[in-house]
Curated annotation (Swiss-Prot):
Catalyzed chemical reaction(s): L-serine = pyruvate + NH4(+)
EC number(s) stated in the UniProt entry for this protein: 4.3.1.17
Subcellular compartments: Cytoplasm
GO biological process: gluconeogenesis
Pathway: Carbohydrate biosynthesis; gluconeogenesis
Family per record: Belongs to the serine/threonine dehydratase family.
Annotated Gene Ontology cellular component terms: cytoplasm
UniProt name for this protein: Putative truncated L-serine dehydratase SDL1
Molecular function GO labels: L-serine ammonia-lyase activity
Organism phylogeny: Eukaryota, Fungi, Dikarya, Ascomycota, Saccharomycotina
Keywords from the UniProt entry: Cytoplasm, Gluconeogenesis, Lyase, Pyridoxal phosphate
Length: 210
């Protein structure tokens, strides 16, 4: 990009997660969700949580903006899911201020950001969001189970959020409430292109995932 700029070409760098334009793009997911809920005659009070995986906080920030635009940011809790080894948001929350991770070790490479966007950190505290950190073993097991159930491959970054589908007790614990059959929990299933099934099996074998 620098070389192209020197030659007179117009260039534009868009940060992968710490950028308002990116957040606005992600925020439209919430608009689509609300539209689909209305089409299916599902009332918003039935939505008990919205779950998404978090790396640098781009998707999370967009979801917050979308909820806020629809006056739902204080009504629907967002559950931010990370994997141990790149849990920069959770570590920042524990410290009380944003931290920078010197080393990223999780297999969920799409979540591997050394820092969290400041807007994401501030929004988490402002709207009372929830933080969950999972092990690589748990996430890989979920990816393999999902592949068996639906014949579809997702990468660990996505498996982190899907893990709560298979283990609702984690969600109930973090929300401090029972999830009933008629309740709605929205899971943002993002990613899928960074790993093949063979990659998942190999990583699972290395980490002794049963």
């Amino acid at each position: 990009m620098a070389q192209e700029s020197q030659h007179g070409s117009k260039t534009l760098y868009v940060h992968p997660f710490d950028n308002e334009t990116i957040w606005e793009g992600h925020s439209t997911i919430v608009d689509e969700i609300i539209e689909q809920l209305k089409e299916n005659d599902i009332s918003l009070p039935r939505v008990k949580a919205l779950v998404c995986s978090v790396g640098g906080g781009g998707l999370f920030s967009g979801i917050i903006k979308g909820l806020d635009r629809n006056q739902l940011a204080e009504k629907i809790p967002v559950v931010a899911v990370e994997t141990a080894g790149c849990d920069v948001l959770n570590k920042s929350l524990k410290k009380g201020s944003p931290v920078t991770l010197e080393k990223l070790t999780s297999v969920a490479t799409s979540l591997a950001s050394p820092y969290i966007a400041s807007f994401a950190f501030e929004s988490f505290n402002k709207y009372g969001c929830k933080s969950v950190v999972l092990s690589d073993q748990d996430v890989l097991a979920t990816c393999l189970r999902y592949a068996d159930d639906y014949n579809f491959i997702v990468e660990p970054a996505c498996g982190a959020s899907l893990h709560l589908c298979y283990h609702p007790e984690i969600l109930e614990d973090i929300l401090e409430q029972k999830i009933y059959e008629d309740d709605i929990v929205i899971i943002i299933a993002c990613g899928g292109s960074c790993m093949t099934y063979e990659d998942l099996v190999k990583a699972s074998s290395t980490l002794n995932v049963s």
